[in-house]
Regions:
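His/Asp/Glu-enriched short active-site or ligand-binding loop at hydrolase and phosphoryl-transfer sites
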Residues: 7, 12-48, 82-90
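Hydrophobic, well-structured mid-protein blocks that either form specific transmembrane helices
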Residues: 1-7
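Acidic/histidine-rich helix-loop elements
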Residues: 34, 62-63
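Short beta-strand segments
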Residues: 2, 56, 87-89
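Histidine-centered catalytic micro-motifs
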Residues: 6, 55-59
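Conserved, mostly hydrophobic/aromatic
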Residues: 1, 22, 55, 78
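C-terminal domain-boundary segment and adjacent tail
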Residues: 65-90
Length: 90
């Protein structure tokens, strides 16, 4: 479970932790911000890429323009760095 806005109270964490694994992110693309250019969105991610990083992109209409530009370029950068994307194992 990824808490919206990366905000969660200790009580919520305890309750959710009974049924779910909590997953926080390291890097947020801010693709939802229509004031940001697609290139800025890409920089928000690639500037901080590192092994083990968890990156957030959003699958919403609001984020589509930036995500459509930044996601494939982020994946290419990941390959260039010799890193791999994989599912989180629980």
């Amino acid at each position: 479970f990824r808490p919206p806005y990366a905000q969660i109270t200790p009580a919520q964490a305890r309750l959710l932790g009974q049924r779910y694994k909590l997953v926080m992110w390291d890097i947020i693309s801010r693709d939802y911000n229509r004031k940001l250019s697609p290139r800025t969105c890409l920089r928000n991610v690639t500037k901080y890429l590192a092994p083990g990083a968890i990156v957030v992109f959003h699958d919403s209409e609001k984020a589509f323009r930036n995500m459509r530009y930044a996601l494939p370029r982020t994946l290419e950068k990941i390959r260039q760095m010799g890193l791999k994307c994989k599912a989180i194992e629980f």
